[in-house]
Amino acid sequence: MINTIIADDEPIIRNGIKDIVDWHSLGFRLTGTAKDGMDALKYIEQEEIHVVITDIRMPFLDGLELIKIVKKLHPDIYCILLTSYAEFEYAKQAINLGAYSYIIKPIDVDEFQKTLSNIKEDFEKCSRRKQYISKLELYIRQLEDFQNQNLFSHQKSD
């Protein structure tokens, strides 16, 4: 499951996002919500989170600052930025900070689900790649051990 958190200062938006998607059927687990960027950051420090869905304008720590910090600490976390503002400057900043997607409110459910499906596909691809790399590293260590054992036994017999 892909662990996800929603950060938005408006409870009606947080609850609406929770309810518009069948998270489980898409392969996601909504692990929590946060009322602002600071709460989200605290939550991310305590839990293994893969996706952050955040509003752009929130008290204490806005969505852009949250993404900036999250990407610095956890570059693999996917960030979706939600906003009521269709301003190009916000979109540009979001992209420069490494946001995966920039969605304008009110949320188009189909667009939102497509974004989540794309994240799932990318997440699974990255997970398979990491597993493959781990297997290769293990195989290389085993080959090195085998080579060292053969070298050691060959030297002993001389």
Where would I find each of the regions flagged by the language model?
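Active-site residues of response regulator receiver
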Residues: D8, D55
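Two-component/phosphorelay signaling modules centered on CheY-like receiver
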Residues: P11-G32
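Acidic, metal-coordinating helix/loop segments flanking the phosphotransfer/catalytic sites
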Residues: T33-V51
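Acidic catalytic/metal-coordinating carboxylates
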Residues: D36-D39, D62-E65, T83
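Short amphipathic alpha-helix used as the core "switch/output" element in two-component signaling
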Residues: K42-Y43, L64-P75
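Receiver (REC) domain active-site loop signature in two-component systems and cognate sites
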Residues: M58
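Interdomain helical linkers/hinges and coiled-coil/dimerization scaffolds
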Residues: I107-D158
